[in-house]
Amino acid sequence: MEVAPEQPRWMAHPAVLNAQHPDSHHPGLAHNYMEPAQLLPPDEVDVFFNHLDSQGNPYYANPAHARARVSYSPAHARLTGGQMCRPHLLHSPGLPWLDGGKAALSAAAAHHHSPWTVSPFSKTPLHPSAAGAPGGPLSVYPGAAGGSGGGSGSSVASLTPTAAHSGSHLFGFPPTPPKEVSPDPSTTGAASPASPSAGGSVARGEDKDGVKYQVSLSESMKMEGGSPLRPGLAPMGTQPATHHPIPTYPSYVPASAHEYGSGLFHPGGFLGGPASSFTPKQRSKARSCSEGRECVNCGATATPLWRRDGTGHYLCNACGLYHKMNGQNRPLIKPKRRLSAARRAGTCCANCQTTTTTLWRRNANGDPVCNACGLYYKLHNVNRPLTMKKEGIQTRNRKMSSKSKKSKKGAECFEELSKCMQEKSSPFSAAALAGHMAPVGHLPPFSHSGHILPTPTPIHPSSSLSFGHPHPSSMVTAMG
């Protein structure tokens, strides 16, 4: 079978084909390799693979790990087909992490590692590797390497299962999928081998290639969950990524939550802490009292303000003001109270002849009049008629002063607010957020916290993905 010229995918490399002609010793793979003249320009290839090396390939602790990690996943292989050889990685002196004396590239690792899923919890791929064909070329799908068969000359060294397993625990960062080249399952389907033999049908290869392309997309989404950086955050409330095919971010609890107390991060304390903290500090009206301080004039020990006389002795506020205004000491004996105007003997109103009133006034002639007659004349310039006279003195309940009214209203408002906050949780609390998020099924879930960082939106939702209520203690009032 001949490959169409519009699919220049592969080139023959002597290190992979044991320096022999591909047609004579590898008849089953001859149609999968193209001449270098049909490949992409070297500049574009170098830029693309440098992009993968800078973002996708992790760094390793020893050369054995590096050897185990060179085989590439279907997600990257889809850009060039089913089988691929990278000569600039095989014989590049500028890569110190590869052993120069060994062609240390594994075609048969026990696990299939993808640079897009650098995770200690990554799954076993759908295409198992065949470690029994050391002479075959490098294969992106390890299962296809077993059918290559053939020579066993300077074969590529294969790793033991222990080394292959240890490759999954390497440190690395999940890469960003390359956007320069987008894989097309329809055009690259024929290049993927569907069976170990070379006579496999192209239609069958395209069918399997479509399945592999979908699998590579689903596996490439598992970028964040099982990174070795994530298990360090496990004590903060996250679960292992093995239970969730599509992982979520761990809960974020700032260190300042333990420093400033639970009031700032309590669900009911969004506005500043527990309900008791809403009450402002009222100015203490108790009189200041110091030990051993006494007014030298009246002997008082409690006063709103302590003053001093000319000699430096302490005076209470009343005695100090009196001394300041009058220049003499405040008399200790209160003066006799003057008789009230209502009790003046022989005084009666010149208009209504009443003898009881709250306040005596005088008319225009200077005669004493009661309070009612005096006000009436002052307002109407007419004497008050006798028909309006009443035996009793009508009094009224005076309204409270505005200051006391405001203070009482403020205290009542704060008490009501504190009661409401105790009975019901704050509308900005984590419980309320969970209530709003629960009926919305297509939104990403919160992972043990109502925290601000959103979780990645799942493309393929799984039944094992749990929508848990956020823990109220880790709610960050981020309105800040």
Swiss-Prot record:
A Gene Ontology biological process in which this protein takes part is: ventral spinal cord interneuron differentiation
Main location per UniProt?
A: nucleus
According to the UniProt entry, its GO molecular function terms are: C2H2 zinc finger domain binding; chromatin binding; DNA binding; DNA-binding transcription activator activity, RNA polymerase II-specific; DNA-binding transcription factor activity; DNA-binding transcription factor activity, RNA polymerase II-specific; RNA polymerase II cis-regulatory region sequence-specific DNA binding; RNA polymerase II-specific DNA-binding transcription factor binding
Q: Which cysteine pairs are covalently linked by disulfides here?
A: none
Span of zinc fingers (GATA-type):
295-319, 349-373
Q: Specify where the region named Disordered lies, as residue ranges.
A: 166-208, 457-480
Compositional bias (Low complexity) spans? 183-201
Q: Where on the chain is Asymmetric dimethylarginine found, per UniProt?
A: R86
Write the record's keywords in alphabetical order, separated by commas. Answer: Activator, DNA-binding, Isopeptide bond, Metal-binding, Methylation, Nucleus, Phagocytosis, Phosphoprotein, Repeat, Transcription, Transcription regulation, Ubl conjugation, Zinc, Zinc-finger
**What residues does the Glycyl lysine isopeptide (Lys-Gly) (interchain with G-Cter in SUMO2) crosslink join?**
K389
Q: Mind telling me which GO cellular component terms the entry cites?
A: cytoplasm; nucleoplasm; nucleus; transcription regulator complex
| Intracellular or extracellular location(s) | Nucleus
Q: Return the Gene3D superfamilies for the record.
A: Erythroid Transcription Factor GATA-1, subunit A
The record's InterPro entries line, in alphabetical order, gives: TF_GATA-2/3, Transcription_factor_GATA, Znf_GATA, Znf_NHR/GATA
* Keyword Zinc part of the UniProt annotation: yes
Give residue numbers for the modification (Phosphoserine).
S73, S192
Subunit relationships: Interacts with BRD3. Interacts with AR and CCAR1. Interacts with MDFIC.
Job description of the protein: Transcriptional activator which regulates endothelin-1 gene expression in endothelial cells. Binds to the consensus sequence 5'-AGATAG-3'. Plays an important role in the regulation of phagocytosis in alveolar macrophages, particularly during P.carinii infection.
Name of the protein in question: Endothelial transcription factor GATA-2
